[in-house]
A protein has these predicted regions:
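Terminal recognition/anchoring or ligand-binding modules at protein termini
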Residues: 1-129
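Extracellular/lumenal glycan-associated surfaces
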Residues: 8, 13-17, 186-190, 223, ...
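Structural detector for short beta-strands of small beta-barrel domains
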Residues: 35-71, 116-151, 202-225, 272-284
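Surface-exposed or flexible loop/turn and strand-edge residues in extracellular/cell-surface modules
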Residues: 72, 153, 159-161, 184, ...
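Structured surface patches comprising rigid loops and adjacent beta-strands/short helices at the edges
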Residues: 80, 85-87, 116-119, 130, ...
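Short nucleic-acid-contacting surface segments enriched for D/E, G, S/T with interspersed K/R
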Residues: 83-99, 168-188, 242-258
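Extended non-catalytic domains of envelope/secretory-pathway proteins
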Residues: 180-182, 229-262, 273-277, 282-284
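Acidic, glycine-anchored loop motifs typical of Ca2+
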Residues: 194-198, 265-266
Length: 284
């Protein structure tokens, strides 16, 4: 009814329709005044924003085929590089609808990108629900539990030529890297070509650290193993606590860090919690 609250989804739908609707312009004046619908839209001709579709093929630290030469805040859609209005790294590999703000001939930035419905099939499997690696139709596959309350497993088939992104960087496909047995993390599988097989495998493999001390140079010492993690300007890193991005200096003793490090140790993704570490004392 007219008194019901409108959902965010419907607001977005109505806004998009309004922005993309063709404009009406006056083509006759005086007694012959009339209006005609043109090919112009509010989005393109007034706001200087164009809409397009494509696939995000590279981000600042990696691409779907290897390394990346992009700067921070840039993405590549198909074969064209854009600046971005916010971090879109989580859309690597996805087919997206995107909006480009045109400020000038050489000044274009993507202000919004969204996965295209029905053109991306993804599945995230946590290490807790990971069962084992297996095969299906001659291809590597992952057997996993649908949830924690069932003993029944499902199987996800991985394409024979699938791309592997391990802890944020491209790697040659390696079964050992996608085997989450006795590990902490998750796997996201993406079928971007709708053939029923997953063609991109994103692995996040975390190592947990309990902060003992943090130096002014970015050296973080683990409280129980004395292992050292160094986050300084020689590496790329991002530290998040909840939805907030924080700095090394914000870390405190007993913070629990889940650290995903690329194999070359040049890229680190760190998630921070204040969870209490539980365990059993096995010796004096």
């Amino acid at each position: 009814s007219y008194s019901d609250k409108i959902s965010r989804g419907n607001v977005a739908y109505l806004t998009t329709n309004a922005l993309e609707s063709k404009l009406m312009e006056q083509t006759g004046f005086g007694s012959d005044g009339k209006y005609e619908i043109t090919e112009k839209t509010l989005l393109k001709d007034k706001l200087k924003v164009t809409k397009d579709t494509g696939r995000i093929t590279a981000i600042e630290n990696t691409s779907l085929t290897g390394s990346s030469s992009l700067a921070k805040g840039q993405i590549k859609i198909d074969n064209k590089t854009y600046e971005t209005a916010y971090n879109m790294n989580n859309l690597l590999g996805y087919n997206v609808t995107y909006y480009v703000k045109n400020e000038g001939k050489n000044d274009e930035s993507v202000i919004l990108a969204m996965p295209i419905q029905n053109q991306n099939n993804d599945l995230t499997i946590s290490s807790e629900l990971f069962s084992k690696l297996t095969t299906k139709n001659g291809n590597t596959a992952i057997e996993y539990f649908k949830d924690e309350n069932t003993s029944k497993t499902n199987t996800a088939e991985i394409s024979s030529d699938a791309t592997l992104i391990y802890n944020g960087k491209y790697q040659a496909m390696d079964k050992n890297l996608i085997d989450l047995t006795d590990k902490s993390g998750n796997i996201t599988l993406l079928d971007s070509n709708k053939n029923g097989k997953y063609d991109i495998v994103f692995v996040k493999n975390y190592e947990n650290i309990v902060v003992d001390s943090v130096s002014s140079t970015g050296k973080i010492v683990d409280k129980y193993s004395q292992k050292v993690l160094k986050l300084d300007d020689t590496v790329d890193f991002r530290i998040t606590k909840g939805l907030e991005e924080i700095s090394v200096s914000d870390l405190a003793e007993y913070d629990v860090l889940s650290v995903a490090a690329s194999l070359d140790k040049e890229l680190y993704e760190v998630e921070v919690t204040n969870k209490t570490v539980e365990g059993k004392v096995t010796g004096k």
